């Protein structure tokens, strides 16, 4: 048995050695953490440097290509932006944080600075894209579409193609469309709405005109089609007006119909209702409970907010000529290709076999297009076959060159941009 003083010495030596070992491990761990933190900082700086000057399709491509790096390093995650945190997808969340973060450039500049406007394209089922709304704007598309459903006890409008994919918490009309649009329009309209000091480089502060979301063409209005899906269209309309569109109306951002002169006054954003919308003018111009009027003049008692204005337009049936004169004044008329072919004693099946519209079909459909234009309506044909690609492209050409359709309805923005 060892003497006590030797045991004590050995124990002290053991404690000293273990202490040195833990100290070395801790030092290595801290060093690795410091290196990792420094690497992340450098990577974040590289991403921010790369993004300078990028916009449009190049910006979209950069985010899709570098998403793992951007997400893993949380490049923009800690930025404080007015729209809060989204949880739509990894790509959407990262892109959203970049757009609405502390970067000094205005949002419209980031999105559309070098973008060529494509005025004849409608982004069908826009909400299916990886970046709803933003992707269409980066391609220069001037018309987008969102399908909406009444959810959460009729207090919210969720964006979805059908009831199976409804997500009212993360994919509502305000999260995907109205909140981003309102923020963008606030950035470029009026000194009281400026969040960025250099936004004045884009627009003249003394200009009283409302400016839109396209950097190179600030006078162009973005058309937003809202497709009513729920059976209760009256409640859908009431919620749309009072909750989602009211902030735009208060800032004069919406195109409207002057109910006294029947004149359409263009704004940065044009709202068109499609699908199962209410058709009665008594519903469209209903007076909400909180609406007030500053006068007892009968002429001031028109419109949903009793301001003599109607802020939405109906997507009128292109294939029903006799109704166009009877329905409310509007800006758009649409029909499916199948509906028009039926009117022309043909069918979609025959067209698919042939691969293009015949001369007789073109002549017949052209009459419907011309009739709509007599009422100053833009036109759109939906339900165009997407396959084979050669048929789709041929039909795109026939719509544009032979029929003079105003909006080519498509799900493929990349191909139509190169068309």
UniProtKB/Swiss-Prot annotation:
Entries under InterPro entries matching the protein: HAT_RTT109-like, PLC-like_Pdiesterase_TIM-brl
Any one GO MF term held by the record is: phosphoric diester hydrolase activity
Sorted alphabetically, the keyword list is:
Signal
Task: Give the residues annotated as coiled coil.
Answer: none
Q: Which domain of life is it from?
A: Eukaryota
Q: Which residues form the signal peptide?
A: 1-31
The alphabetized list of GO BP terms reads: lipid metabolic process
Q: Which family does it belong to?
A: Belongs to the AIM6 family.
**Protein name (Swiss-Prot/TrEMBL):** Altered inheritance of mitochondria protein 6
